[in-house]
């Protein structure tokens, strides 16, 4: 009892004289914009790795960037979430064929009569103004970081041929070289059809053998039938004798996502809570995982050709004068490459991402890896021990390689010795055989020469 009273007395004195700092550890706010799957604005991922500074005992020798286009309008198409589908739904909201009950107190859709849509079907697929700024700024930052490698007179910039990707690559070039961009660059447009073969930067379009497989549609339908009914039930009372469909919910998510991309604000996002956004984010993860990622056999095949080309460039560092490599592409090409490089080993075709419930801890989160303007940068260093080491940056964060040992610090610094990296079981099939596998298993078109990525 004496000790208890002594402790309480001591505590009272401490509390009376203490200058308390506000405890903020539990004050984190949910930022829904970072959970809009691949339609999220650019942001860093959550796997906070080591510092991205160059190691003090190493010298940068090569850098390879695989860069997604900037923020854009919806893709063309009539389906829900596509440009025409969203535009038609917007018109139905405005003309009353999707009848909002404005008599309901606190109706979150009460703004619709004075709302002016910014999503237009005529702008389908086009890069947004913010997308141009994003890529310009990224090009500027890339040049500032790696300027010592820019020792050539011109640089080949490979880009998937779709206009928004080409525009992104051009704005990136302006960020690096300013008005002299055309004096320093050679833009090489890579076809987005099957003729590109293993050089494709939209490899899902260059693999005829995969065309008959559709694992994505049943996966998405299954998940939508889990998470959308509660949303429909919650929102239905705000409409007059109208029951929302899954397509309606998808279009509401689409308006929210693309208004954020086009103007960084959307009243429609207020219809959803944090759980809704996490469930929508998971839908995006299922789409990538079952479409071209780690839940299907095609994921590592689609990404293997780039992985093999990258590995060839890394291996030839001592005989190669080229030090900077550029490839501009889509989100749907970056995820397969990262799959082939062994980033997402927790799910496989034998253990796919579940469609009846959400796995919060899965590794492949599209919001983190491929937001608008997302990128995968591969750095090659030579260190004081004369060995070469590989490191990946995902959207300005070091990806925590854990399958191939350590860097020269002998700690978890995100670096691996070059041949330990290339020969690791999680990626050796891609780094050694990716092009051959793509050619054979995809029944791909032959190419005259392999592009150096």
UniProtKB/Swiss-Prot annotation:
Subcellular location: Secreted, Cell wall
PANTHER family per record: ACID PHOSPHATASE PHO11-RELATED, MULTIPLE INOSITOL POLYPHOSPHATE PHOSPHATASE-RELATED
BP-aspect Gene Ontology terms: cellular response to phosphate starvation; organophosphate catabolic process
EC number(s) per entry: 3.1.3.2
GO cellular component: cell wall-bounded periplasmic space; cytoplasm; extracellular region; fungal-type cell wall
Catalytic residues in the record: 69 (nucleophile), 331 (proton donor)
Organism from which the protein derives: Schizosaccharomyces pombe (strain 972 / ATCC 24843) (Fission yeast)
Sorted UniProt keywords: Cell wall, Glycoprotein, Hydrolase, Secreted, Signal
Signal peptide positions on this chain: 1-18
Record-stated family: Belongs to the histidine acid phosphatase family.
Top-rank lineage group of the source organism: Eukaryota
Glycosylation-annotated residues: 95, 151, 183, 193, 243, 319, 410, 429, 443
Pfam families xrefs: His_Phos_2
Induction remarks: Repressed by phosphate and weakly by thiamine.
Principal location listed in the UniProt entry: secreted
GO molecular function: acid phosphatase activity
Annotated catalysed reactions: a phosphate monoester + H2O = an alcohol + phosphate
Protein name: Acid phosphatase
